[in-house]
Design a protein with these regions (language model features):
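Short hydrophobic alpha-helices and adjacent helix-cap/hinge residues
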Residues: 1-130
Length: 130
């Protein structure tokens, strides 16, 4: 359900909840990041379990996130910026892809949704918010 504006986000989540959707996957893009607090709150209000692509949504109350470690990406970008400032040509630098991903689980959100997170999932999480 693509929705990029606040009113459409609210409508989309209400529709999903009304259709008894089992859950929500929120991709890590600029629109969802801009409106992440609204999405987190609406998902909680509609009792929709959601997995987010950015850690920040889980920190703000979302159930869980799995995605690229943003800090690691910024470190890599800084190295590239340094190389360019030292004279290397940007077009000659190899393309790099994310290599570090993180799983963050919010147990408070899980409890509010009456979800028991399996111990095996907790064991592999990079961060557990209690």
């Amino acid at each position: 359900m693509p929705a990029r504006e606040p009113a459409k986000i609210a409508t989309a989540l209400a529709t999903l909840a009304g259709e008894r959707g089992d859950g929500l996957i929120v991709p890590p893009d600029p629109a969802t990041n801009t409106h992440r607090k609204q999405i987190v709150d609406l998902a909680a209000n509609h009792r929709l379990p959601a997995i987010y692509g950015l850690r920040s949504a889980t920190v703000e109350g979302g159930l869980m996130s799995y995605g690229v470690d943003i800090s690691d990406l910024f470190r890599k970008a800084a190295v590239y910026a340094d190389r360019i400032l030292k004279g290397e040509k940007p077009g000659e630098l190899p393309v790099q892809f994310p290599t570090k991903f993180e799983l963050v689980i919010n147990l408070k959100a899980a409890a509010a949704l009456d979800i028991a997170v399996p111990p095996t999932l907790l064991a592999i999480a990079d961060e557990v918010i209690e």
